[in-house]
């Protein structure tokens, strides 16, 4: 009885460990996707400033 109880507890811990690892990997992927989206937003927010700068330079030299 002790051996089977030990085996059940051991397998439960292994299963829990695997689930935690998968959860951690999923969270890391989600965080990477959020980081990518925030980078895209930052770059897109720079576009109007770049356009204004180009147009100002064109007016200055044009």
Curated annotation (Swiss-Prot):
Its annotated compartments are: Secreted
- What InterPro entries has UniProt attached to this entry? Frog_antimicrobial_propeptide
Q: In which tissues is it expressed?
A: Expressed by the skin glands.
Point out residues bearing the modification Phenylalanine amide: 61
Pro-sequence residue ranges: 20-40
Indicate yes or no for the key word Secreted.
yes
- List the GO terms this entry assigns under cellular component, sorted alphabetically: extracellular region
Q: Which domain of life is it from?
A: Eukaryota
Question: Chief location of this protein?
Answer: secreted
Does the UniProt entry include the keyword Nucleotide-binding? no
GO BP annotations of the record are: defense response to bacterium
According to the record, the signal peptide region is: 1-19
Q: Which UniProt keywords apply?
A: Amidation, Amphibian defense peptide, Antibiotic, Antimicrobial, Cleavage on pair of basic residues, Secreted, Signal
Role = Has antimicrobial activity.
Protein family (similarity comment): Belongs to the frog skin active peptide (FSAP) family. Phylloseptin subfamily.
Name of this protein: Phylloseptin-Az7
